[in-house]
Amino acid sequence: MKPPILIICYIAVVTLPLALSWLVGGPPRAFHQELASGLGILAFAMILMEFVLSGRFKTISNDIGMDVTMRFHQMMARIALGFAVLHPFLYLSTPSGGQRPWDTTRQLTITTDISDLSTGIAAYLLLPSLVLLAIGRTKLDFKYETWRLIHGVGALLIAVLLLHHTVYAGRYGSQPVMTAVWLAMTGLSVGSLCYVYLVVPLLDKARAWHVTSVVRVASKQWEVTVAPDGHSGLIYDAGQFVWLNVGNSTFSLRENPFSISSAPAAGPEISFMIKEYGDFTQNIGQIKLGTVAYLDGPYGSLSVERRTEPGVALIAGGVGLAPLLGILRQMRLTGDPRKVKLIYGNRSVDQIAYRDELGLEDVTYVLSEQPEAWQGETGFIDGPLLDRTFSREEFTEWVFVLCGPPLMMDVVEDHLIMRDTPSHRLLSERFSYD
């Protein structure tokens, strides 16, 4: 689905409850009261839409890109939080105490029934906690699967609490039409969560894989290869990624996103370049051959297939080489006539992976800690290095594919924009958003 259509669909779904509230509501209230209700309605609708912006739905993420999907997910969560925080304060001057006999439409008052308000208060306290935890998760000592569990359960709990609060405490939510809409939207959102954590694992169970190779390719970096068990494998484009689960139940939360470093043209086996970092990856080299594995994917739009630019520029930092290596391998195996250049940055020489395979032609190695007699580039991947590597025509006509540390990508993207590289020729993948 194309980005403009996705944007229109998002706006339509989020504003649907607001529009219906205006159509089915009673006599208008004071502006600050209507604003309070409107912000609350928008906040709830946006929170429900967060479930389908999780990045696990290919119709969305594979067309607009995983980076755009997750950044939009984060941005909308923060805006929804802002709306939710403001919502109760705009009612401060509204008479309370519940409905009056002469005010059957609840035009003049708001409820003080604690049974109706308590769920809203609970959600009001949980929502900022969940958002702040997501923002700071990389700085907290949480295992990845623990954070995923907290995030998923927390989001589900907030949705259920807000549904009760909206239907029973809200002036508009109590209308039969609005109640039906909120029930349907909440049901679809919760259903999307069940699909990701129940239906997908069931489907994956019928398409198991097994580990065929675990090879060290550089300091603390490994290549893990898996082969399909009794099925044809995975259809994917070079540069995409999957959620990889090794040695666990399909329902386990111990799965991680890894870019595919092999090429589709190489056959059904799939390889991943994985760095020892923490949780599952710190023991990656100890995986035994034959261990069962499950793949959910492919995801992502970091692909140069079907593009028409005359050249491809691959810019990688560290383990960010993985998807770019898949692209390079595919181009070499298929005899792709397009020109290609690779810039590959690392801290030290022992971190350079696949050096023999990559070779020297049209490959620029960059080290921030260069040893004696180092012949390649030194320092970091920056503007001057890019200017030495690419011509003016290449900046404007080639497609640039980036993957690596956020700081490196920020520097490279800024310089490419300064050199008039069109945004549609700039593909990037971060896997880190805060």
Language-model features: locations:
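Short, hydrophobic transmembrane alpha-helix segments
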Residues: A19-E34
